């Protein structure tokens, strides 16, 4: 069983439990005043919770699609044990790093709460974009597909806009921070452990690819 499947299973089990258990929900949710009381575990446990079934499904579906690929890349590059450890480290640290700017911004807000694995999933998705920039990506139920690097650019721009305008209850800042972390993490582990500049690999893939089909329609 892969680490991706284990993460999905654990997250799904805890999320389903919390749907009907308000005590568990309040104990695990990211709540700045509680963190200030040194409940630091909340930097991680909020990622085990989701607002509803749809929220859980989309996060875990994305993690399955992109996490399976990135876990495979890391296992191939670093071996089974080290590759799996690095993958899990990226996911867990993604939870922490993606919520830190939100904590700084909302640390004095007693009404603020956050939950969901989106920040860590964004780290995995952007790691995928870095490795496979010319693979086509799209949004579920919208039959338009773009090269991954273009999708990533649009995603970041839209997220910045929505965060600036405080649109909805989605933590767009965590998505952006998580995505940046995923790219930085991949760059660091490949440069430090393999002596490979993954950014050069990213640019080369874009340069050698055909630009005739930048957009695909349909499934």
Question: What do these predicted ranges mean?
Answer:
Residues 1-219:
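A detector for small-residue-rich transmembrane helices and their helix-helix packing motifs
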């Amino acid at each position: 069983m892969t680490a991706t499947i284990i993460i999905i299973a654990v997250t799904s089990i805890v999320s389903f439990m919390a749907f009907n258990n308000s005590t568990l929900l309040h104990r695990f949710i990211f709540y700045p005043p509680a963190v200030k009381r040194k409940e630091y575990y909340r930097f991680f446990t909020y990622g085990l919770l989701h607002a509803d079934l749809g929220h859980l499904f989309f996060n875990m579906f994305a993690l399955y699609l992109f996490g399976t690929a990135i876990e495979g890349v890391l296992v191939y590059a670093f071996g089974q044990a080290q590759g799996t450890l690095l993958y899990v480290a990226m996911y867990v640290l993604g939870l922490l790093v993606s919520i830190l700017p939100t904590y700084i911004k909302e640390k004095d807000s007693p009404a603020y709460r956050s939950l969901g694995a989106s920040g860590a999933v964004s780290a995995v998705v952007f790691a995928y974009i870095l490795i496979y920039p010319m693979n086509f990506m799209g949004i579920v139920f919208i039959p338009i597909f773009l090269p991954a690097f273009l999708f990533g650019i649009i995603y970041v721009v839209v997220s910045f806009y929505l965060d600036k305008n405080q649109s909805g209850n989605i933590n767009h800042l965590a998505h952006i921070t998580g995505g940046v972390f995923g790219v930085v993490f991949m760059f660091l582990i490949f440069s430090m452990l393999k002596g490979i500049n993954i950014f050069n690999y990213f640019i080369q893939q874009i340069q050698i690819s055909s630009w005739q089909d930048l957009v695909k329609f349909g499934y």
